[in-house]
Amino acid sequence: MQSYTNRICAVCGDTPAKIHYGVLACFGCKGFFRRAVKDGRNKYVCRFEKNCEVTKFERNACRYCRFRKCLLVGMNPDYVRPDREKSKKGKTVLSKKKSVSRSLSYRLADPSDWTSFLSPSSRKQLSEIGKLAETCSTSTNFDGIGNFSLKSLIADRSLARKTGDSEAMDCSNSPRQLNEQFLGIERIVQCVDYIDRFLVMLEEEHCRKFSVEDKSALISDTMIHLLLFESTSRFVAKGAPGLEDLKLSLAQLPICTTHLTQKIADVFETYLRKPPSIIEYSVLKAYIVLSAESTVLSNSLNESLSLARENLSELLFKVIKHSRNKTSISAANSLSTILHFVYESRNLASRIRQSQQPFFVRDSDPKIPFHKILTDIINPEVSDLLLTTANCRKLSTQMGSSLSSVPPVPPPSDTVPLFHFSPPSLSPCQISAPPPPQQQYTDYSQMPSTSSYPANSSPFQSPYRPNSLSSFPKIPLEMTKSIEEFLRPNGMTTDEMNKPLEKNWADGFRLTPVFNKDIVSQFFPELSNINQHHPF
C-alpha cells in the first residue's frame, strides 16, 4: 500500500492525492472538476488539436483537455453536489440574521433595565440587599443603652424591630449626615441593625437560627471593616482631598493611628481607582459581612456564610458586567480590583482594631460613653479553648510562685518514726506529738494533730504522706458475686443457668440435623472422628 506522501494524482501527477469523486486526485483537480461540472461543462474550448498534455506544471494551460482527462481517469460527475454550498450559505445567513436581531433587541431595550438579564433569584437577592443598605434607624436618643454590652444591644435592637418601636427610613436620599466620629454610637447601632437584618435574611434562606453569641462574634469581627468601608466611600466622593479627611477621621480614635498613614493611603487609592456604583456598593457591603474570620464563628454560621459568599460573588460579577455593559473579561478584571480592595481594607481594619485594644481592656473602669459596647467590638471575649488553657497555665504558674514562700516540710529521716499527719487543729492550745504507730491496725481518725506541722500554712495544702506502706496492715480481698449470680432467679441452680457444652454437642439430634454433619466436621475437625460413632 502506498504511503500518504507517495499517492499521485491520476489527472496531473501531483502529490499528495486522496480519493475525490472516485479516483486519486489532488486538491487542485478536485476543485477544478467540481467547478467544471457545475458551470463549465459546455463552455471549455481547446485552442489546439484537443490533445494537450496535462501535467502539474501545465494543467492550467487547457481546461478542456484537463476536464476530459478527469472524465477519462474515472471521476464521476454524479458525486458532485451543487446544493451543498447553498445549504452552507443558508445556515450562515440565518445565523447572521439571528445575531443581528439579538443585537438590535439589546439596543432597543431600556438601558436602565439591565436587571432583566439576571435570573429571578438573582433579582430577588439584589432587591433584598439593596433594601438593607438603604434602610437605617431613625432613633437619635441612645441614653438608654449607655451601660449595655454588645449582646444586650443586639437583643434590644431585635426586640425593638419586632415590637415596632424602632422605625426605619430610606437613608439613600436623606440629607442628614451621620456622626463624623469613626466610632460614633449612631454609626455602630446602624451597623448592628444592618448585620442583624442580614442574618435574619440568611436564616430564612437556609432555614437556620443563629445564636446571640454568633451574632456578637460576627459583629465584632466585621464592625471596623464596615465603618472603614463607609468612611472611604463617603470621602472618595470628594476626590483626592478626601484622603486627608479620612486620615483626620481615624486620628480621632483614642489611640493615634499615624503609623498606618501609608496603608490608609494605599487603600484609598485602590478604591478611588475604580469606585463602585450605588448597586455595587450595596452588594459589596454585604460581601464584607460574609468575609468574616471563620475561627470565631460556629460551624453552622460558617457554612451559611460560605454558601452566601459564593452566590454573592457571582451576583457581583453579573452586576458589574450588565450594569456597565462590559465583556466577561473586563468584568472579571473589575471584580478582581474590587475584591482586592475588600481584602486590603480588611487587613487595615484588623490593624486599626489591634492598635485600639490597649485602650479597651476588658473588666476595666469605663472611660468613655458606651465603653462596654466598644470593648466588646474591639476587644471581644475570647472563648477559644487553647487560649483559655494557656491563661489557666499562666495563672497556675503565678499561684505556684506565691506558694513557694511557704517553708516545705522536711522529709523524715531513718531515725524518726513515721506517723500520720492530720490537718491542723483550730484550737489555740498546744498539742503534743502522738506515740509511734505499732504493727497492728490503729484508728488514725481519732489521733490528735502534731505541733511539728507548720501552723502558718494553708489548711488546703495536703500534708506529707510517707511513700512506704509497710507499717499498715493489708486488707484481705473478698470475692464478690458475679453478674450471672446477681441475675439468676431465686431457686435456680448453677447448672441450669450456665451449663457448659459437652464435646459431642454437635452430635445431638436436636442441635445438629443429619444434613449438617459434614458442615460441622469442616468447621470442627477435632470432632469429625467422634461424629462417626454417634449416628444421627
From Swiss-Prot:
Gene3D superfamilies: Erythroid Transcription Factor GATA-1, subunit A (3.30.50.10), Retinoid X Receptor (1.10.565.10). The keyword Nucleus applies. Residues 427-465 are annotated as: Disordered. The keyword Metal-binding applies. A zinc finger (NR C4-type) spans 9-29, 46-70. One of its GO terms (cellular component) is nucleus. It comes from the Eukaryota. GO terms for molecular function: nuclear receptor activity; RNA polymerase II cis-regulatory region sequence-specific DNA binding; zinc ion binding. Residues 439-465 have a biased composition (Polar residues). Residues 155-378 form the NR LBD domain. PANTHER family: NUCLEAR HORMONE RECEPTOR FAMILY MEMBER NHR-31, NUCLEAR HORMONE RECEPTOR FAMILY MEMBER NHR-31-RELATED. This is Nuclear hormone receptor family member nhr-7. It comes from Caenorhabditis elegans. The gene is nhr-7.
